């Protein structure tokens, strides 16, 4: 198998003049970009970095972040990308846990980095429109003289270490080898039916599995990566229209924002022929609106994780809303009963069709990681009998398609019944007055937990109207919300996942 450095060189050799990356006014071909990557690779060596070392980035989606990523692959160095919003204590934990040797930041993340203990110990390079100082070099200084890159990495080298944003405790490092990354990139190309020269929007963060895969897969087909440093609907629409973007791969929240913008018009996105989403379930209403506005040739629901990139794929998401499809080309999946035997057991108890359980995935798959970084406690919880316990709940329908219903931790147990939030959210999303909805279980003396719907409205509506909407649907009565709370915003993570724990703890503002 080719390592990732050779994968990039393959793209340069195949079509050196093809436009590789766009970031504002910056436009580089594969041949031009390669010399920037090579110059940075040589800088790594000048600092004594070697295969197996790790470097830290606290950057938005910019040209520098993508260049650093590829330079690391060339050198066999692992990149440890963090959210640019990371606080000093988060930077310290991840940097110390990963034992990084060098860091890259930009203006927006500089103060938090310098306030961290890491900032006092590890050399930092300044990216973007920041001049170098006596103490800190500027990124642009490192690439003044272009150098051809050399693929010195290996498929067994760690390519990237993503830190998962756990709901409790410290984040877990997910080391992914170049072998698994290349397999995931090729799978992404195949499952999204990429053509040579595809153009996509580089807005999903490069500290997130979706963002990394977007970058890698574009190289495999000599595509163009149009960098959008942070989510801004108007800038995203401008980029789609100007650069004639052909494919979008976003979380549902960003699609929601796009359709809700006054600047959105079908004509502005007519170049987009393929849509994909991942990171969170998409409600039925948004799915149908997107299909009507874009008329995509392909509409992919991709279900996976940082640990194993692809679990399942549905290449026609509109045909059966809510279906995550069937196992991806490198995956095997099962649904096991929520209540299992002792952890020492060498077998699982499997759920029946239509029975909700926990989704698991075979760790022998080409896209899988091999265990968490320095976290045997996390391995013991999530790795069992050669399978990865995803922590997600779902079920197979009669045709063998997977429906993802939520997280094991999000399961509402009301009056002894297990209730998943996603089904209720999809039904409420179809009400014309509902802009966004999230469902959670709140403590109840009689039921244990009661189903509560948190609603952001697009037009006036009251609880009785929403309740009648649920009663007239096929939602069984015990799943019907017992309370409706109208909020100004639904709390979400930086990549658009609903933060139900904040709803449960009362961390929201009523409308």
Q: PLM features: residue spans?
A:
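Conserved ATP/PPi-binding loop(s) of AMP-dependent carboxylate-activating enzymes
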Residues: 341-381, 419, 461
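Conserved AMP-binding/adenylation subdomain of ANL enzymes
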Residues: 182-199, 207-247, 261
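Conserved structural elements of the adenylate-forming
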Residues: 33-39, 174-195, 203, 207, ...
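Conserved pre-ATP/AMP-binding loop-to-beta segment of ANL
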Residues: 16-17, 131, 145-163, 170, ...
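Gly/Ser/Thr-rich phosphate-binding loop
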Residues: 220, 245-249, 259-323, 328-332
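Conserved AMP-binding A3 loop
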Residues: 29-32, 159-183
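ANL superfamily adenylate-forming
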Residues: 108-155
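AMP-binding/adenylate-forming catalytic core of the ANL superfamily
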Residues: 65, 86, 103, 248, ...
């Amino acid at each position: 198998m080719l390592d990732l450095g050779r994968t990039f060189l393959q793209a340069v050799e195949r079509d050196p003049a093809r436009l590789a990356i766009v970031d504002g006014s910056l436009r580089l071909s594969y041949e031009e970009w390669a010399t920037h990557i090579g110059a940075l690779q040589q800088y790594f060596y000048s600092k004594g970095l070697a295969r197996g070392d790790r470097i830290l980035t606290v950057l938005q989606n910019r040209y520098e972040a993508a260049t650093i990523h590829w330079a690391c692959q060339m050198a066999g160095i692992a990149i440890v990308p963090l959210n640019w919003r990371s606080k000093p204590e988060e930077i310290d934990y991840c940097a110390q846990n990963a034992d990084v040797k060098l860091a890259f930041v930009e203006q927006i993340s500089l103060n938090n980095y310098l306030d961290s203990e890491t900032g006092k110990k590890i050399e930092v390079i300044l990216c973007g429109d920041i001049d170098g100082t006596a103490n800190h070099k500027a990124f642009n200084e490192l690439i003044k003289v272009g150098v051809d890159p050399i693929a010195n990495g290996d498929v067994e080298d760690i390519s990237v270490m993503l830190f998962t944003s756990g709901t409790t405790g410290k984040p877990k490092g997910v080391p992914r080898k170049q072998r698994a990354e290349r397999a995931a990139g090729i799978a992404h190309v195949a499952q999204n039916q990429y053509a040579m020269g595809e153009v996509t929007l580089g807005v999903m963060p490069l500290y997130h599995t979706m963002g990394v895969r977007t970058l890698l897969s574009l190289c495999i087909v000599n595509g163009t990566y149009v960098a959008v440093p942070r989510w801004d609907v108007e800038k995203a629409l401008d980029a789609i229209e100007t650069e004639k973007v052909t494919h979008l791969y976003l979380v549902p929240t960003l699609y929601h924002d796009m359709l809700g913008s006054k600047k959105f018009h079908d004509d502005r996105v007519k170049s987009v022929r393929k849509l994909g989403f991942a990171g969170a379930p998409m409600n039925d209403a948004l799915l149908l609106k997107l299909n009507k506005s874009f008329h995509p040739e392909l509409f992919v629901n991709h279900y996976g994780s940082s640990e194993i990139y692809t679990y399942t794929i549905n290449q026609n998401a509109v045909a059966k809303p809510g279906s995550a499809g069937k196992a991806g080309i490198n995956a095997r999946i099962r649904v096991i009963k929520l209540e299992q035997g002792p952890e020492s057991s060498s077998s699982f108890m499997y759920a029946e069709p239509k029975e909700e359980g926990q989704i698991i995935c075979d760790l022998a798959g080409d896209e899988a990681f091999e265990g968490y970084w320095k976290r045997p406690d996390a391995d013991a919880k999530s790795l069992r009998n050669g399978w990865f316990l995803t922590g997600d709940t779902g079920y197979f329908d009669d045709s063998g398609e997977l429906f993802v219903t939520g997280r094991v931790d999000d399961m509402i147990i009301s009056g002894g019944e297990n209730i998943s939030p996603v089904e209720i959210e999809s039904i409420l999303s179809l009400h014309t007055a509902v802009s966004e909805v999230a469902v959670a279980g709140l403590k109840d003396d009689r039921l244990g937990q009661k189903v509560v719907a948190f609603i952001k409205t697009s037009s006036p509506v009251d609880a009785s109207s929403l309740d009648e909407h649920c009663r007239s649907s096929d939602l069984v009565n015990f799943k019907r919300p017992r309370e409706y709370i109208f909020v100004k915003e639904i709390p979400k993570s930086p990549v658009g996942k609903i933060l139900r724990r904040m709803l449960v703890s009362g961390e929201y503002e009523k409308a």
